[in-house]
Amino acid sequence: MKITKVAVAGTLESSDVQVRVQPFDSLDIEINSSVAKQFGEQIEATVREVLAKLGITAAQVIVEDKGALDCVLQARVKAAAMRATDETINWEAVL
């Protein structure tokens, strides 16, 4: 999947996460979280795993975490990535 435009998913409410995805020449992940010292590596690993499953190798991803659970983070990354592409989504692969 190729990222072709800027897209956002999520909110800045407590227990949620806002994920911003935009075109970039390589994979760049920025994590802003109050719990980054404890969970920063896990947050980055989850983002990388979701992007790999979607076949994304070049994008800038900015994560503004407010204490979201892992499943919420996965859903927000998927939603932002799908909004940021013009490609037809293969729903069987996504689910």
Curated annotation (Swiss-Prot):
Q: Which UniProt keywords apply?
A: Cytoplasm, Phosphoprotein
Residues annotated as carrying O-(phosphoribosyl dephospho-coenzyme A)serine in the record are: 14
Question: What's the superkingdom here?
Answer: Bacteria
Q: Which InterPro entries match?
A: CitD, Mal_deCO2ase/Cit_lyase_ACP
Primary location recorded for the protein, binned into one broad class: cytoplasm
Subcellular location, in the record's words?
Cytoplasm
- CC annotations in GO: cytoplasm
| Cytoplasm in keyword set | yes
Record flagged with keyword Transferase: no
Tell me the function of this protein. Covalent carrier of the coenzyme of citrate lyase.
Instruction: Family membership, please give it.
Output: Belongs to the CitD family.
Q: Which HAMAP family match?
A: CitD
Q: Assembly and partners?
A: Oligomer with a subunit composition of (alpha,beta,gamma)6.
Name of the molecule in the record = Citrate lyase acyl carrier protein
Q: Which organism is it from?
A: Haemophilus influenzae (strain 86-028NP)
**Lineage in the entry?**
Bacteria, Pseudomonadati, Pseudomonadota, Gammaproteobacteria, Pasteurellales
Gene encoding this chain? citD
